């Protein structure tokens, strides 16, 4: 695992650990050394996770994770760092590789691209703003109204935590979302999305410029994220480098 991939991987684990501690989440520890099942009570697989260092993966722990989510009737994802031996234990209990994320990073000193000059940015601080953030994120990622209660509750809990939720604003209209999670010298970017009607108008580049500004403000060395296949071209255009795949094992065929 190279340093850049390691920064992406470690930031993801820290972010999921922060979600584990929220009132809107339900979790179960899997190993004394670390690792857990995390339910956000969402019906979306990508909102429910198993996090376990690959050297701690065993068939017994995989079966425990299956029971945890099976009892709740929820889909989930289980990321692994590349093609490692732990994958066989997951396949052995019936999980399959259902998709891959790309580990990507960008030096915090990079020059932001121009775009979306009409946009301003707002840090989510109130319950009303959190619910608005949740609605925009849900729609921007392709969800249909109404916004699930689990998504609304999760956003409200995240807004009250050390995680930083941001909204891109066109006047008083919220048009994009992102979430920032710091760990050591990395700043993780999550829930980065723009409403369909504002795509290809510079909004996403302007949002990335705001992320870069925040990274410099925090003294971060590197911005990290896990990109879906659909997001990789944009992040490459924004200057991100790819560091390898993160396979997602799941009990569902639909993980994005």
Predicted region positions:
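N-terminal charged segments
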Residues: 1-72, 87
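Conserved active-site alpha-helix within GNAT-family acetyltransferase domains
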Residues: 84-97, 205, 217, 229-245
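Acyl-donor-binding surface of acyltransferase catalytic domains
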Residues: 54-128, 227, 249-251
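A conserved beta-strand-loop-helix scaffold within acyl/acetyltransferase catalytic domains
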Residues: 145-195
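A short, well-structured alpha-helix characteristic of acyl/acetyltransferase catalytic modules
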Residues: 127-139
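A short helix-loop-beta-strand connector motif used in the catalytic cores of GNAT acetyltransferases and
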Residues: 21-29, 72-75, 81, 98-101, ...
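Conserved acetyl-CoA-binding loop-helix of GNAT-fold acetyltransferases
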Residues: 58-67, 191-194, 200-213, 217, ...
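A conserved beta-turn-beta hairpin within the catalytic core of GNAT-like acetyltransferases
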Residues: 43-49, 98, 181-190, 199
